[in-house]
Amino acid sequence: MADVDESDLKILEILRKNARTPYTSIAKELKISEAAVRKRIEKLIKMGVIKRFTIDYELENEIRAIVMVKTNPQIPTPEISKKIIKIQGVEFVYETTGDYDILTVVRGTNISSINKTIDDIRSLQGVLSTNSTIVLRVWF
């Protein structure tokens, strides 16, 4: 991140909170031109700092769970992570340190759909065990 300066970090923070923030609003807050904001964002995309623009959403009656995954050390964790992210219902996959190698966030419309997603994760070669917890509230 050597080419990322303080203004870039401020832009990233603004976009993290609301990816739809108009460039004019960002420019006004940072006291720079709209063209400068546009160039900086293009640079951040080209550098791979900004991976994608997305939305956070919450549907009524939707359930989220955190699923921690312990993996077989003989199978590279990234191989397993790449398979997990393709499973229906998996929203995020994080490789972590500690007792578990992977932490995932899964979404479903009911407990059965969450359970199916967890079963799909457990069925992958290299997954030794999982530990799941239901999310009660999400704060943005």
UniProtKB/Swiss-Prot annotation:
**Compartment annotation:** Cytoplasm
- Key word Calcium present: no
- Residues forming the HTH asnC-type domain are 4-67
Q: Which residues bind DNA?
A: 23-42
The organism's place on the tree of life at top rank: Archaea
Q: Does the keyword DNA-binding apply?
A: yes
InterPro entries for this protein: ArsR-like_HTH, AsnC-type_HTH_dom, Dimeric_a/b-barrel, HTH-Lysine_Regulator, HTH-Siroheme_Decarb, Tscrpt_reg_AsnC-like, Tscrpt_reg_AsnC/Lrp_C, WH-like_DNA-bd_sf
Q: Which UniProt keywords apply?
A: Activator, Cytoplasm, DNA-binding, Transcription, Transcription regulation
Assembly, per entry: Homotetramer.
- What functional role does this protein have? In the absence or at low concentrations of lysine, activates the biosynthesis of this amino acid via the alpha-aminoadipate (AAA) pathway.
Q: Which NCBIfam families match?
A: trans_reg_LysM
Name of the protein in question: HTH-type transcriptional regulator LysM
